[in-house]
Structures are given as structure tokens and as C-alpha cells.
Amino acid sequence: MYKYKVIMTGGGTAGHVTPNLALVPSLKENGFEVKYIGSKDGIEKEIIKNNNIPYFQISSGKLRRYFDFKNFSDPFKVLKGIKDANRILKKEKPDVIFSKGGFVAVPVVIAAHLRKIPVVAHESDMTPGLANKLSAPFCNKLCVTFRESLKFIKDNKGVLTGSPIRNEILHGSREEGLKICGFKQEKEVILIMGGSLGSKIINDQIRGKLNLLLRDFNIIHICGKGNLDNNLVNKAGYKQFEYVSEELPHLMNTADYIISRAGANSIFEFLALRKPMLLIPLSKKASRGDQILNANSFKNEGYALVLNEEELINDTLYNKILELKSNKKIIINAMNNMNGKNSIDLIVEVILKSIKR
């Protein structure tokens, strides 16, 4: 018998969904029944259903910072989404809503506020995304990942919790990872991750220096859907994947170094695993600049080296990898000196307190 019911929401990208999944086991241990509200065709639908969590779908319009003719119709989708969410909340009667952001979350948060249901939200990046900015007035508490984020949260709603880490990430097997990749030589391993869709510029840079890199390293390259290079399928010491799921914990634990974009959820997983990282954040041309802030924060803490996209010319990436290798012990020592409580426990504590008020 459950003590409480929480309805989670968040979607649009995997980064708005996977942290929710990290919380589910602890929520259930604390007596919560867990259900989910997402969009009709977002990435969250498949992910949540694959984890056997009851799923409700609502209408949702995308929130854009740029001109698009859909900006005229999407507000009506948001209004319908509020109506859809209100109907679900009236029937389900949850004790609390937990929002991870993304455009689908806004109607749910507003509907919860109208029904006087407490809302706890979480922001992964250093500055709040548009969805969390719009949701903030209707939230009881907004959990943040970076200490620097607290200054952006009004009305004393901000709580520093860090980023929830999926338990399975911490229990990968290096031996299994090496088996998956089929590496024959004993070399240090670099894992390259270009985000869920891959990164052409990172892929091209790595492959352009591949023969040089393979002298000293084995390479695991998660290159994104449609980005496999058929000419490199049987290249010794080089294993490429379009996308990985169940294998990811093993591959991450196999890696000695990680080259990656700077999404907050991912880099905190690397930190939890004590993996020295070279971060190549999305440029301001392709984003709101949040990854640049994330990367620089980790650089300042001594957890990472940073190489901006516009610096990816000639031998800069190769030289930065050599610098990462030479600073391996220093970076790991900085990570080991980190003062960090269990983020999942902190977030669940905030959720419980929001109910008991």
C-alpha cells in the first residue's frame, strides 16, 4: 500500500526524462506510487513506457525563443494541455508533482497550481531553461544542480541538490565493456559522446586524427544515428556505435577519458565515475549557451578541460587530449575532493517536505 502518489513530468529530450527515472527507485522505497504525464509523441513516451510506469499523454506546444509561424498556434495547444492535465490530476489526486522541465511540463505545473497541488521542479543546467522560467512562479521549490544557479531563483525557492545519477551508471563493468568493443591491445580508452544526435564536427575531428590517436588509445565512438563510417567498421582499436542504451554503463566504466558535449546530466555522471573529461560545449549559435556555462564551471572546479567549437582547428583537439592524459591524476584528485551528498536523497527529501507542509 502506497503512502503517497507523485506524478512526474518532463520531456522533449532525454535529458528531461532520464533524471526522473533515476529518482523512481528511491521514491518507491519512500512509499510513493509513481505515474507520469508527457506529450503524445515525445521521446519521453517510449522511455517511460519501457520502464513500466503508467503514462498519461497531453497536448503540448513547443516553447521557442525564435520566430516561427507555429508560435501563433502553439499557445492554444498549451491551453489544451492545461485542460488535459487538469482532468488527469482531478482523477489521480496526486500528493505532489515533480517536473524536470521541457515544454510538456508547463501545462502540468500550471494545472497543479490551480488545483493547489505542490510542485517541485529540477533544473539541470546552470541557468533555468525557458520551461522552468515559466514554471517557477507556480513551483514550491526548484532544485538546482550548480551552486551558481541559486542566484537566478527568486523567492527563496532554490535548493542545491545536484543532479540525480542513475544507479545502473555506477555499476558498469570494464571487463564487459572491453568485451563489447573487442579491443585486443592493452591501451587506455577514450569514449567520445557527441550528444543524443551526435556531432558532425566532433566526429570529423576524431576520424581525421584517428590513426594518430590509435597509437596510444583505444577509441569508443558514439557518433549518432546515421553517422557510422562504413570504411572504419573493422578498424582495430576503434569501435563505433550510432546509439547505445544497455551497454552505456559498461562503456562509461571502460573509459579512462571522456570527450563529450557538456549537457549537465551527462557531465555529472562522468564526475560520479571520476572520469577525466574534455568538454566541447554546444556553441551559442546552436543553443542558449547553457553548455558553455556548465563546461566552464567544471573547468573552474578542476574536473574538466574545455575546448570550444570555434577552436576545433588543425591539431587543437589532439593536443588537448594529450593535455588531458598528462593531467589525469590532478583531475581525479580534484574529483575525489568534491564535497557531495547523494543528490537523489536530497531531491526526495525536498519532495517529502513539500507534501508535509
UniProtKB/Swiss-Prot annotation:
Its EC number is 2.4.1.227. It is an enzyme of class 2 (transferase). Gene3D superfamilies: Glycogen Phosphorylase B. Keywords: Cell cycle, Cell division, Cell membrane, Cell shape, Cell wall biogenesis/degradation, Glycosyltransferase, Membrane, Peptidoglycan synthesis, Transferase. InterPro entries: GlcNAc_MurG, Glyco_trans_28_C, GlycoTrans_28_N. UDP-N-acetyl-alpha-D-glucosamine binds at T13, A14, G15, R166, S196, Q291. Pfam families: Glyco_tran_28_C, Glyco_transf_28. One of its GO terms (cellular component) is plasma membrane. SUPFAM superfamilies: UDP-Glycosyltransferase/glycogen phosphorylase (SSF53756). It catalyses: di-trans,octa-cis-undecaprenyl diphospho-N-acetyl-alpha-D-muramoyl-L-alanyl-D-glutamyl-meso-2,6-diaminopimeloyl-D-alanyl-D-alanine + UDP-N-acetyl-alpha-D-glucosamine = di-trans,octa-cis-undecaprenyl diphospho-[N-acetyl-alpha-D-glucosaminyl-(1->4)]-N-acetyl-alpha-D-muramoyl-L-alanyl-D-glutamyl-meso-2,6-diaminopimeloyl-D-alanyl-D-alanine + UDP + H(+). It is found in: Cell membrane. GO terms for biological process: carbohydrate metabolic process; cell division; cell wall organization; lipid glycosylation; peptidoglycan biosynthetic process; regulation of cell shape. Belongs to the glycosyltransferase 28 family. MurG subfamily. Cell wall formation. Catalyzes the transfer of a GlcNAc subunit on undecaprenyl-pyrophosphoryl-MurNAc-pentapeptide (lipid intermediate I) to form undecaprenyl-pyrophosphoryl-MurNAc-(pentapeptide)GlcNAc (lipid intermediate II). This is UDP-N-acetylglucosamine--N-acetylmuramyl-(pentapeptide) pyrophosphoryl-undecaprenol N-acetylglucosamine transferase. It comes from Clostridium botulinum (strain Eklund 17B / Type B). The gene is murG.
